[in-house]
Regions:
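Flexible, solvent-exposed loop/hinge segments and secondary-structure transition points
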Residues: 2-196
């Protein structure tokens, strides 16, 4: 086989050919994996809703509502049992030390926190990931049963009554900001439903 001459034209053709092949392969892989990824994410969300608002008999993930608070849109998943409203799960996020921290917070009809699930974070491994358990029932920073409408949740370092994660105050603040934002969305959604 004859060797091609090293010229600008031949290099451009070779680079274009490689780019087209690589782009086609990436597009194909994206097409093949998009549906399984979407299904896995839907299952993660459904499982998280079941943790933060247990005992429902509807499918809250099927018909989320969107509520806008201060220009930010929040998804709210209403849970019912026997047609009665038993609570809602609210997706919220805020910026922590390493990036976005995304949570799903469950509220009962009175606005008390039932539970939460840390959906994703970009915090320091080993520190930021502690938020997944630190604020759970019985843990050191337990927020379950609290109503952010009565008093916004803040860390004790800022005059609040929630213990921050050891060596991770910024993450703790970000987590509590996300929980407080979730409550605001929940409260606005509840107010909107009462006026309809």
């Amino acid at each position: 086989m004859k060797k091609l001459e090293s010229s600008l034209k031949n290099m451009a053709l070779a680079l274009t050919g490689f780019s087209v092949i690589a782009g086609g392969l990436l597009g194909w892989v994206n097409n093949v994996t998009a549906e399984p990824i979407a299904q896995a994410n839907a299952k993660i969300l459904s499982d998280a809703i079941a943790v933060v608002v247990p005992g429902f008999d509807n499918n809250p993930a099927e018909a989320p509502e969107s509520v806008e608070v201060e220009g930010v849109s929040y998804k709210i998943y209403k849970a019912t049992k026997g047609g009665e409203f038993i609570g809602a799960a609210v997706e919220s996020s805020s910026m922590g030390f390493g990036g976005e921290l995304k949570v799903l917070v469950g509220f009962d009809p009175e606005g008390k926190i039932i539970d939460y699930s840390l959906l994703s974070h970009s915090e320091t491994p080993g520190l930021g990931s502690k938020a997944a358990e630190w604020f759970k029932k019985g843990a050191k920073g337990d927020i379950t049963g609290k109503n952010p409408g009565e008093k916004a949740l803040t860390v004790s370092k800022d005059g609040g009554d929630v213990d921050a994660i050891t060596a991770s105050t910024i993450t703790s603040r970000a987590f509590l900001v996300a929980v407080n934002k979730a409550f605001e969305a929940y409260k606005n959604q509840s107010a909107n439903n009462e006026t309809k």
